């Protein structure tokens, strides 16, 4: 099953958190990480509801939720947008004893980007914001990197091809030893345009454990595009390990989970048994929870992954989804896996 063109989701593109949402009304609230702690208890501590506005202090709300018994950490993230144009608020918790995704300490080196890359990337972000507001976010990943349909964005992305070829070593050094998280995020995105994708896979997989959310998200976007090219050219030398993506399905950060699930849909397209076994061992509860999210484009990747991991045929998965039987499938697969 194709993931609705497998377009990477632009959630306040290349940024994270509530600040980018600018206080819109909440259309949908969804949760993840709930195992023993109930949704009702988290909702009470959240103290906002559908139809209200996003909380003015993300940190204050997270702190309230973290006071609940059994909650180690909480995280709020707003995504744009539901079918009515309202914000989607994701509330994640990590319970005591639950799976935990570890990040590396911040790098302490002195690597920095070549000066000419930074202003072009800044213009790229601005162009993406304009394109997103007008709904022009379609992109082509078949070259192993993003080329958006919007001509202004695409022209800037095409400059990244030259930068990645010219400055591969510099980008690699910034990812591993750059003290500035913004520069590491830029490097993780631009290096994805390298002409020989197979030579930078290890650098991007290293970035998947960066302590900064945006660095990880950009690395996932780059690797997800590599996976599209790998599927198109199965004899290529591109080899992407699914392990860190699978571990990220248990992350406290919504962007980690969402982008990891999108990438894994491509990486499990061949249904390689060793990868499906990893999903069954490490991520079935997380997948079932994510597959039940109310916003269907966000739920679909996990729904596909849960179905594949549990041996459901692709046609049956697609048929049940189109008939609106998603929740029944999730319940059935979850029950079967628990036996």
Where are these regions (language model features)?
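Bacterial N-terminal signal peptides
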Residues: 7-17
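Alpha-helical scaffolds that organize eukaryotic protein assemblies
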Residues: 263-264
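Periplasmic polypeptide-binding modules associated with outer-membrane biogenesis and secretion
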Residues: 22-35, 44, 48-107
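Ordered, soluble secondary-structure elements with a strong preference for glycine-centered loop motifs
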Residues: 52-56, 245, 287
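Extended repeat-based scaffolds of very large eukaryotic assembly and lipid-transport proteins
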Residues: 100-198, 206-209, 213-243, 247-258, ...
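Positively charged n-region of N-terminal signal peptides that target proteins for export
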Residues: 1-7
């Amino acid at each position: 099953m194709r993931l609705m063109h497998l377009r990477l989701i632009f959630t306040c593109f290349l940024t994270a958190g509530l600040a980018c949402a600018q206080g819109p009304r909440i259309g949908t609230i969804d949760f993840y990480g709930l195992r023993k702690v109930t949704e009702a208890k988290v909702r009470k501590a959240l103290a906002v509801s559908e139809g209200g506005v996003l909380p003015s202090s993300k940190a204050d709300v997270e702190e309230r939720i973290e006071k609940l018994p059994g909650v180690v950490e909480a995280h709020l993230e707003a995504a744009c947008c539901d079918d009515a144009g309202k914000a989607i608020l994701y509330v994640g918790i990590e319970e005591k004893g639950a799976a935990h995704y570890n990040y590396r300490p911040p790098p302490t080196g002195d690597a920095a980007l070549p000066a000419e890359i930074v202003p072009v990337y800044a213009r790229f972000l601005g162009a993406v914001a304009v394109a997103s507001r007008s709904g022009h976010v379609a992109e082509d990943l078949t070259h192993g990197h993003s080329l958006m349909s919007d001509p202004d964005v695409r022209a800037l992305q095409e400059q990244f091809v030259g930068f990645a070829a010219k400055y591969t070593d510099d980008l690699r050094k910034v990812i591993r030893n750059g003290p500035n998280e913004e520069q590491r995020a830029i490097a993780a995105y631009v290096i994805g345009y390298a002409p020989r994708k197979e030579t930078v896979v290890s650098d991007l997989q290293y970035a998947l454990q960066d302590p900064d959310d945006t660095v990880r998200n950009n690395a996932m976007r780059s690797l997800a595009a590599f996976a599209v090219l790998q599927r198109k050219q199965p004899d290529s030398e591109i080899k992407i390990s699914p392990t860190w993506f699978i571990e990220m399905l248990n992350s406290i950060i919504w962007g980690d989970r969402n982008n990891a699930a999108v990438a894994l849909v491509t990486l499990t397209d061949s249904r390689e048994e060793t990868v499906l076994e990893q999903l069954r061992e490490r991520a079935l509860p997380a997948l079932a929870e994510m597959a039940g999210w109310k916003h269907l484009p966000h739920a679909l990747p996990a729904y596909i992954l849960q179905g594949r991991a549990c041996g459901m045929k692709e046609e049956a998965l697609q048929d049940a989804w189109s008939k609106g039987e998603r929740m029944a499938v999730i319940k059935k697969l979850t029950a079967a896996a628990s036996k």
